[in-house]
């Protein structure tokens, strides 16, 4: 059995590296290219880059930035943000990006996902599901365009439909836990895991390596992703790019 991948997630806004709390309160923390270089040195398993400004503002992907990131990156790279069609996805993969990540597309134009899976291979297509608990119903609901638009769709339903349309991987992203570093919602994630028939990666909530270990041991998933955990250090959240060394990473699996 393959060991789960430990995946840093970097958020990009207008070309700069930022961090958010519950998809808001953007804080500029540096240059994404510099962060990639550091994760190269630390031999990260994989890297995810999400352009939140492209997602929120409906802009096309920043191809120049993506190409520079791909050229710099020495590990498998996934990219999401602003991808609306097969041509854009194909161009991004041509830079050396391993997987493209789409979110809003799964609701607004899911047939494009089927085309991507057919022509690019479903292993290259990840559907990200951004969800949070609504104040009125206290039920989980999917939000799109970087959390700015309600859909009325449950994450469970979207997960099933995304797989039907050809997604080769699901990225579950908790808006409520984004940047708060208080752990994952294990009970909710277990429900997702029970109905997910493709590889599943989880993002949102990690505040310690123990949180990663709990997720791996409880869910048996292929990928554990985190943002704040790998860019902050200490209770005052000083910016310091970090990643577990080989010994600490091995301890997560046993």
From Swiss-Prot:
Its main location: cytoplasm. It is an enzyme of class 4 (lyase). It holds the Pfam family His_biosynth. GO terms for molecular function: imidazoleglycerol-phosphate synthase activity; lyase activity. This is Putative imidazole glycerol phosphate synthase subunit HisF. The keyword Cytoplasm applies. Disulfide bonds: none annotated. Heterodimer of HisH and HisF. InterPro entries: Aldolase_TIM, His_biosynth, HisF, IGPS_HisA/HisF, RibuloseP-bd_barrel. It is found in: Cytoplasm. One of its GO terms (cellular component) is cytoplasm. Pathway: Amino-acid biosynthesis; L-histidine biosynthesis; L-histidine from 5-phospho-alpha-D-ribose 1-diphosphate: step 5/9. IGPS catalyzes the conversion of PRFAR and glutamine to IGP, AICAR and glutamate. The HisF subunit catalyzes the cyclization activity that produces IGP and AICAR from PRFAR using the ammonia provided by the HisH subunit. The lineage of its organism: Bacteria, Pseudomonadati, Spirochaetota, Spirochaetia, Leptospirales.
């Amino acid at each position: 059995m393959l060991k789960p991948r430990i995946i840093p997630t970097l958020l990009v806004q207008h070309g700069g590296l930022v961090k958010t709390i519950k998809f808001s309160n953007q804080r500029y923390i540096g240059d994404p290219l510099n962060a990639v270089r550091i994760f190269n040195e630390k031999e990260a398993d994989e890297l995810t880059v999400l352009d939140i400004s492209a997602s929120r503002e409906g802009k096309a992907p920043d191809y120049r930035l993506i190409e520079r990131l791909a050229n710099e990156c020495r590990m498998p790279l996934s990219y999401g943000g602003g991808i609306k069609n097969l041509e854009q996805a194909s161009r991004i993969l041509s830079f050396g990006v391993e997987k493209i990540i789409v979110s809003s597309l799964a609701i607004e134009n899911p047939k494009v996902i089927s085309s991507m899976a057919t022509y690019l291979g479903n292993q290259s297509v990840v559907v990200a599901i951004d969800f949070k608990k609504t104040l009125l119903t206290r039920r989980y609901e999917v939000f799109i365009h970087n959390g700015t638009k309600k859909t009325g769709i449950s994450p469970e339903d979207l997960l099933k439909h995304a797989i039907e349309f050809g997604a080769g991987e699901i990225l579950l992203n908790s808006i409520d836990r984004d940047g708060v570093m208080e752990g994952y919602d294990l009970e909710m994630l277990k429900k997702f895991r029970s109905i997910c028939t493709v590889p599943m990666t989880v993002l949102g909530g990690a505040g310690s390596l123990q949180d990663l270990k709990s997720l791996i041991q409880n869910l048996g998933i292929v990928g554990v992703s985190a943002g704040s955990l790998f860019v902050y250090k200490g209770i005052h959240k000083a910016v310091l790019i970090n990643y577990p060394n080989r010994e600490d990473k091995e301890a997560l699996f046993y």
